């Protein structure tokens, strides 16, 4: 059964619907003065080739053809929609199609107007509106009947005095408790420096008692991880772009310790990524005082020393808002933002101090940043994120998306896990961690920024039933 994705664009023109087929085999995109003049698709229906109608009108500006290999399929479409000239309704001004094997109809470039994405599985049909131009485009998406990484989302009941509405904060789990630190309600205005603790047995929040070197700044864009019974938090900034250093919090004694002052550790930053294994805490990327960062640093909790990992190379771009997870001894960097969203995937091998870029395939999520992520066995699970920056940067909401995807780090294949229902709403700038609730391991996600620029206060868990 195929899922119909709502057409993106204007509401002018004749409605057309090509229907659902086994696969899309060829795409024709006609260029016009202001954008896309027409589209036409060819489909496979069993052994039969079905040639669809032209939607819009040809011009003398040429037609681009994109042929899909017989063992491949389209997994997402990116485009831009905009009111142009004296039009009263939006038209489609740019389209790019990408397949499961990474083949792209044309490079995806930033354009004026509003970016949109059609994604979530194997695309098996299209629909939309057109006059003498293409006004809107939607798709039909087919999903595998049962994902290899089977699970489901639950909304966790919350009681007590919790973090409330916020985004750009950090969470981590120790035993049967989830901790939350930092964040904002109003853009660029940190809320507090309380350490909130959620008891999974009572489903109740409280504020943890704090002694010792309590972080001196209330901060946003902070990250936090746990190793054993200890929390580690690094960076984050206040409203004047002053930064926090590197701290630990002993959950058995409720004591903060300043491990590395801000001027002595890795480059001060916010909106970076953190991960940990049994002996090391990793800090990657983020936004410094002058520019984004692409370095990876590790802190050995036994030796209490920092190690500056090798440079990932010139082809690896600076970025913030990336996914960072440790899987089977390797440190994985997934996607992020370098001025625009990117979709490259790399891993770092601590044993060899070496970087490797990998090519992933399958039902691949489109470029995004500031998404939720977790490591579950050999998989990296992600949810949501931002697909296009707001013109007002962090002050605005940006274009946010939903969708739960998993990357198998052994086969390098992506799959979509949810099926467009029972899923948290679109969001980004969430706090997330790998966690265990009611005996299941999965992705824990709290809060985040909504497409309306409001903040969420909900707590969700994607629990894995089988791997």
From Swiss-Prot:
Where do the Kelch repeats lie? Answer: 177-225, 230-276, 280-329, 331-375, 379-434
Q: Look up the EC number in the record and give it.
A: 4.8.1.5
Q: Which PANTHER family match?
A: KELCH REPEAT PROTEIN (AFU_ORTHOLOGUE AFUA_5G12780), NITRILE-SPECIFIER PROTEIN 1-RELATED
SMART domains this protein is in?
Jacalin
Q: In which tissues is it expressed?
A: Mainly expressed in roots, and, at low levels, in seedlings and leaves. Observed in seeds.
Q: Does the keyword Iron apply?
A: yes
Other facts: The proton donor differs depending on substrates.
Phenotype upon knockout is:
No visible phenotype. Reduced simple nitrile levels in favor of isothiocyanates in tissues corresponding to its main basal expression.
Q: Which GO terms describe its molecular function?
A: carbohydrate binding; lyase activity; metal ion binding
Which PROSITE patterns does the record associate with it? JACALIN_LECTIN (PS51752)
Instruction: Name the UniProt key words of this record, in alphabetical order.
Output: Iron, Kelch repeat, Lectin, Lyase, Metal-binding, Repeat
Any idea which residues are catalytic in this one?
237 (proton donor), 292 (proton donor)
The name of this protein is Thiohydroximate-O-sulfate sulfur/sulfate-lyase (nitrile-forming) NSP3
Q: Which Pfam families match?
A: Jacalin (PF01419), Kelch_KLHDC2_KLHL20_DRC7 (PF24681)
Family label: Belongs to the jacalin lectin family.
Quickly give the catalysed reaction.
Answer: a (Z)-N-(sulfonatooxy)alkanimidothioate = a nitrile + sulfur + sulfate; (Z)-phenyl-N-(sulfonatooxy)methanimidothioate = phenylacetonitrile + sulfur + sulfate; (Z)-N-(sulfonatooxy)prop-2-enimidothioate = but-3-enenitrile + sulfur + sulfate
> What is its biological role?
Specifier protein responsible for constitutive and herbivore-induced simple nitrile formation, especially in roots. Promotes simple nitriles, but not epithionitrile or thiocyanate formation. Converts allylglucosinolate and benzylglucosinolate (glucotropaeolin) to their corresponding simple nitriles in the presence of myrosinase.
Return the GO cellular component terms, semicolon-separated. Answer: chloroplast; cytosol
Binding annotation for a (Z)-N-(sulfonatooxy)alkanimidothioate: 237, 270, 292, 321, 370, 429
Q: What class of enzyme is it?
A: lyase
Necessary cofactors: Fe(2+)
Gene expressing this chain: NSP3
Name the positions where Fe(2+) binds.
386, 390, 394
- The Jacalin-type lectin domain is annotated at 2-143
**Biological process terms in GO annotation:** glucosinolate catabolic process; nitrile biosynthetic process; seed germination
InterPro entries xref list = Jacalin-like_lectin_dom, Jacalin-like_lectin_dom_plant, Jacalin-like_lectin_dom_sf, Kelch-typ_b-propeller, NSP1/2/3
């Amino acid at each position: 059964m195929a899922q119909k994705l709502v057409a993106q664009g204007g509401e002018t023109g004749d409605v057309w619907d090509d229907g659902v087929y086994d696969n899309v085999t060829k795409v024709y995109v006609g260029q016009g003065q202001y954008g896309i003049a027409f589209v036409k698709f060819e489909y496979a229906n069993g052994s039969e080739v079905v040639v669809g109608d032209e939607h819009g009108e040809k011009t003398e500006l040429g037609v681009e053809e994109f042929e899909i290999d017989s063992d491949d399929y389209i997994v997402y479409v990116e485009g831009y929609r905009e009111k142009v000239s004296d039009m009263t309704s939006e038209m489609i001004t740019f389209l790019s199609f990408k397949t499961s094997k990474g083949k792209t109809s044309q490079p995806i470039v930033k354009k004026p107007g509003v970016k949109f994405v059609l994604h979530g599985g194997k695309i098996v049909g299209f629909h939309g509106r057109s006059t003498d131009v293409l006004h809107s485009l939607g798709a039909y998406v087919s999903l595998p009947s049962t994902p290899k990484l089977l699970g489901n989302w639950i909304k966790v009941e919350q009681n007590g005095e919790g973090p409330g509405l916020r985004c750009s904060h950090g969470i981590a789990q120790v035993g049967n408790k989830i901790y939350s630190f930092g964040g904002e309600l109003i853009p660029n205005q940190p809320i507090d420096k309380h350490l909130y603790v959620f008891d999974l047995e009572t489903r109740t929040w409280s504020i943890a008692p704090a002694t010792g070197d309590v972080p001196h700044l209330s901060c946003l864009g902070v990250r936090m991880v746990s190793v054993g019974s200890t929390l580690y938090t690094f960076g984050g900034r206040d409203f004047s772009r002053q930064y926090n250093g590197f701290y630990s919090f002993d959950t058995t004694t409720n004591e903060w310790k300043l491990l590395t002052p801000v001027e002595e550790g890795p480059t001060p930053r916010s909106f970076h990524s953190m991960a940990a294994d049994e002996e090391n805490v990793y800090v990657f990327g983020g936004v410094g005082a002058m520019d984004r960062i692409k370095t990876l640093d590790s802190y050995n909790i036994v030796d209490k020393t920092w190690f500056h990992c090798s440079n990932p190379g010139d082809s690896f771009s600076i970025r913030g808002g990336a996914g960072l997870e440790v899987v089977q001894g390797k440190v994985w960097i997934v996607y992020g933002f370098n001025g625009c969203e990117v979709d490259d995937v790399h891993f770092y091998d601590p044993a060899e101090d070496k970087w490797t870029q990998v090519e992933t395939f399958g039902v691949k999520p489109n470029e995004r940043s500031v998404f939720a992520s977790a490591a579950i066995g050999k998989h990296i699970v992600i949810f949501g994120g931002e697909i296009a920056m707001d013109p007002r940067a962090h002050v605005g909401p940006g274009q946010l998306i939903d969708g739960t995807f998993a990357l198998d780090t052994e086969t390098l294949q992506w799959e979509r896990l949810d099926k467009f229902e029972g899923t948290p709403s679109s969001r980004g700038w969430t706090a997330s961690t790998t966690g265990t609730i009611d005996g299941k391991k999965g992705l824990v996600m709290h809060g985040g920024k909504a497409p309306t620029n409001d903040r969420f206060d909900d707590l969700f868990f994607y629990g894995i039933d089988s791997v």
